[in-house]
Amino acid sequence: MMALSSKIVALVALNLLVTLVKGATVILIEEEIEIPRASLNEEPVIGILAQEMSYSLAAKYEEDYESYIAASYVKFVEGAGARVVPIWINKSREYYENILPNLNGVLLPGGATWFNQSNGYADAGRHIYDVAVELNVQGGYFPLWGTCLGFELLTYLAANGEEHREHCSSNNQALPLDFKPDFRKSRMFADTPDEIIEILASEDVTANFHQYCITEQNLTALGLDEEWRVMSTNMDWNGLEFISTIEHKILPFYGIQFHPEKNIYEWVRNKNISHTPNAIKVSQYFADFFVNEARKSEQRFQDADDIDRHVIYNYPVSFTGLKKSSFEQCYLFEGNVDYLAPADASKDQGSDASALVQRYVERSKKKCIKNKRRNSCK
């Protein structure tokens, strides 16, 4: 906690220096950072963190996939005007230090994985969180957005890995938000149109699918209430009050416990997900807010070719809903997944073709072994 506090002091000092140099208006804690329109990035690129294959998703595929990204998160970001770069798990700290300075923000998605799995979602999240803090402390602007499990991960990392979530019962629960009296002091809701606030406060438009909750008491017990602002709460099926929206008081880090991407892009049957015009409208608000935060980041890839090598368009998307998944579509990644090599890489077309053939052979063998025909696998 002391280390983060000192970084925050440095952030304030550096931001004040940036104010003098760039003419931006930077106001502390209870106020908002404003950046002149001319300096806004009109081509934001946002990273979305992959995660381990869930048991249910892995069981539906014979292929040896090791991680995935639900396509609804990709569409959520793209629908607000940004491009997406997948961020891999099971990588060294150096990888995250190298990729984040090219991006304008990171989305930590919801899902079904554990924080104690080695080299997985949470470990990658730790690297991302630390690098994001440094980028902001150095005078940049780098937002993080956590949805559901991603929101839980943000506070887990802020607590230096001390588990503070409570078991709760908020699965398949559509709710309005119970706003705090001072919620308008937040960056997330300071300029939200009254119509959006009215819908959020009165209609069952937030889709909740979580078995863990974070309460205000949890934050206070760890001293996190000094750094994080709670804007709204909700009650689970059993009457437990939990935090539903949160943001860091200085850093551009945001968390929501519900799933706005599901209202717009998930069509799984028998799920309590509202698809009314009002539900779509408020869900789009959250996407727009996050992407507009990312527009305040001036970081860039080296050039257009560099972006093209990294964007998620390079990877196929699967119709997982056809297999009764809770996601309509997913990007499924093998363990050796990577970004495309530069155009001037030393490999020639012949060696590339050979590598593709070898990869196909290895996948076929793994599939054969998984189907318990080991003796016939060659």
PLM feature spans:
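N-terminal beta1-alpha1 cap of cysteine-dependent amidohydrolase-like domains
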Residues: 3-250, 260-378
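Catalytic His-Asp charge-relay segment
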Residues: 252-256
